[in-house]
Amino acid sequence: MSLVPATNYIYTPLNQLKGGTIVNVYGVVKFFKPPYLSKGTDYCSVVTIVDQTNVKLTCLLFSGNYEALPIIYKNGDIVRFHRLKIQVYKKETQGITSSGFASLTFEGTLGAPIIPRTSSKYFNFTTEDHKMVETLRVWASTHMSPSWTLLKLCDVQPMQYFDLTCQLLGKAEVDGASFLLKVWDGTRTPFPSWRVLIQDLVLEGDLSHIHRLQNLTIDILVYDNHVHVARSLKVGSFLRIYSLHTKLQSMNSENQTMLSLEFHLHGGTSYGRGIRVLPETNSDVDQLKKDLESANLTANHHSDVICQSEPDDSFPSSGSVSLYEVERCQQLSATILTDHQYLERTPLCAILKQKAPQQYRIRAKLRSYKPRRLFQSVKLHCPKCHLLQEVPREGDLDIILQDGATKTPDVKLQNTALYDSKIWTTKNQKGRKVAVHFVKNNGILPLSNECLLLIEGGTLSEICKLSNKFNSVIPVRSGHEDLELLDLSAPFLIQGTIHHYGCKQCSSLRSIQNLNSLVDKTSWIPSSVAEVLGIVPLQYVFVMTFTLDDGTGVLEAYLMDSDKFFQIPASEVLMDDDLQKSMDMIMDMFCPPGIKIDAYPWLECFIKSYNVTNGTDNQICYQIFDTTVAEDVI
């Protein structure tokens, strides 16, 4: 690494960020996920930073190169991001990587050397940058609490999540979904550490060294997506393991009960779970080396109990954990409950034997789902008659609008008290006439971002262009006495890329002039427009079938949801590539391709049973409700 000639960069405080801009920022790390492999070949890291304005910014950073992402070791580190793109998603400002994105990371400890961490060979770092890092260190020392999650083994307790700085002594592959790490930090756990049975495993490491340190080493099982990281680790390297989980297990041996402490790194990246290799120059590694050197290598070997005899409490010799040892090594649920937490869990085998209607809380894995092509899951639903219908395809919608364009606009219906009208004639289309009516607000034409257009004779392409420039567009045609809506096969309102449809069965269309009764003629709320026009609006919903398996039984549950389950609006997903990618990532995380179900995450769900009668046949069906994807699951 070397410095390049100084360039004057401008850094934007976090309280002054605006969507659609590309900025340079400094911040103190408040939360982060170590880089992990996302869908495809890119690595992803999630970093939340804060600065002196006390405004937080969450950044989603992607790169095909693991080392190109910020090299963050703990909360409190200071980062500098260049060319960070700012966007607004779900009303929250967030940062994402843009072309040329670059980062530097600094230790946040007061008095520590200011040494930039970066994989770049060349970077810019001036005296002003030096001052900025020092200023943020001072501010963070009085405004941010030290990380309480970073613990030594001597301080850990059962049922705890913590970060551990340690040295790797040995490793072994257990199966495709789990991996064993033997580590130490120079201190002893308050309870004897469990031991994974390794007689059938190939252990890499100095066995005699491990044996001499057996009272100071712990066995950690890592699962799922962390396995490929564990495989790549070198024995002797210094690690930081994030969100390590402890659990106390009792064991019966020779008429006495003893306790052992288990260590698990569960699958997924929730709560920042992951593994990072620390360089030997890291200040925490310096302290760790001192602890290891001073550790008493001749500690009393008889005070620890090696747990290898009881099959119920040690790792099976076959090297595989039963899929449904839920209480032992499950990861945190990839979904969360939004209500009814008082309900006890019910196994699927019991649910399948009970009559409907009932409500249940379950914990299961997603064995499969339909439809596999996720865009096919988006439907239109009438909340009144409960009719489900397909979302019209672009080609079908274009035909509907072209049919409406065959009628010439009636001159008598133009330029009324409600709207001003403009007519143009198309070229090379037999002189097709298109009428655009600009709806007025108290007799005055509003700005384009507040203006509603009524369009006669427009094609889908023309309407889409107008909907990008104006607040809203309603396709209409000339009636006998007034403008009227097209058949409800077409949208009754178009806003940007979102098409709002109405139910043909439940709607009773009223005159376009009823738009005059709307008090607010600037925001054009779809439900308000629908109400004055006599339309029962259809809702965009995701409709899917989940095959759930908890080891006691298999059950098919129906999901129908507009935006709560995926936290993605069904109305927007068809026109937004980023939302489609997010949904693909969620489903690939629920039901990962190419691996066994053992490695799938658990889903905590509420389901309700109900009876469906088809002729003389009665069937019990199940539907997921009051459940949502955990926000930090990806």
UniProtKB/Swiss-Prot annotation:
Gene3D superfamilies: Nucleic acid-binding proteins. GO terms for cellular component: chromosome, telomeric region; nuclear telomere cap complex. GO terms for biological process: regulation of telomere maintenance via telomerase; telomere capping; telomere maintenance via telomerase. Pfam families: POT1, POT1_C_insert, POT1PC. The keyword Nucleus applies. GO terms for molecular function: G-rich strand telomeric DNA binding; single-stranded telomeric DNA binding; telomerase inhibitor activity; telomeric DNA binding. It is found in: Nucleus; Chromosome, Telomere. InterPro entries: NA-bd_OB-fold, POT1, POT1_C_insert, POT1PC, Telomer_end-bd_POT1/Cdc13. Keywords: Chromosome, DNA-binding, Nucleus, Telomere. It comes from the Eukaryota. SMART domains: Telo_bind. The keyword Metal-binding does not apply. Its main location: nucleus. Component of the telomerase ribonucleoprotein (RNP) complex that is essential for the replication of chromosome termini. Is a component of the double-stranded telomeric DNA-binding TRF1 complex which is involved in the regulation of telomere length by cis-inhibition of telomerase. Also acts as a single-stranded telomeric DNA-binding protein and thus may act as a downstream effector of the TRF1 complex and may transduce information about telomere maintenance and/or length to the telomere terminus. Belongs to the telombin family. Homodimer or homooligomer. Component of the shelterin complex (telosome) composed of TERF1, TERF2, TINF2, TERF2IP, ACD and POT1. Binds single-stranded telomeric DNA as a monomer. Associated component of the telomerase holoenzyme complex. Found in a complex with TERF1, TINF2 and TNKS1. Interacts with TNKS1. Forms heterodimers with ACD. Identified in a complex with ACD and single-stranded telomeric DNA. This is Protection of telomeres protein 1. It comes from Macaca fascicularis. The gene is POT1.
